[in-house]
Amino acid sequence: MDRKKDPSNNLTERRVSKVQRPNKKKVRNQVESLSRNLERNKEGQLLQTVSKGHLEADSGHSLGREKENGELGIRSIFYDKDWNPRGTAPSHYRNIPYNPATFKRRTEVQARLGNLENIKIPK
């Protein structure tokens, strides 16, 4: 018998015969596997959509510098109406937004100026 005509030795012929006469059990398993993958992909896409929505919502609230100059204005923890109205961070410090719950003062700050009482303190 010729090698090319013998289906057991011809790889192309074997592949074609598998497609033409598929095994029912293998087909069922492949369909189930594909349906599980499709469900998993849908869940992943949903999570990606939710994460993307959170990212877009959070993009307005920066935890670091805003723009190139690092100014946050009144939202900065370094903001002071008299001394630092632009809310610029000192050099080598990261500017973050002010959170009243996190940075709440427990006591009133008392100035200890000694004999320097003539210096004006911003209120």
From Swiss-Prot:
Compartments where found: Cytoplasm
Presence of the UniProt keyword Cytoplasm in the record: yes
Protein name: Altered inheritance of mitochondria protein 4
Subunit and partners: May interact with the nuclear pore complex.
Entry GO terms, CC: cytoplasm
A UniProt-annotated Pfam family: NpwBP
Record keywords: Cytoplasm
Superkingdom of origin: Eukaryota
Stated family: Belongs to the AIM4 family.
Composition skew (Basic and acidic residues), residue ranges: 1-16
Disordered: annotated span: 1-42
Basic residues biased stretches: 17-28
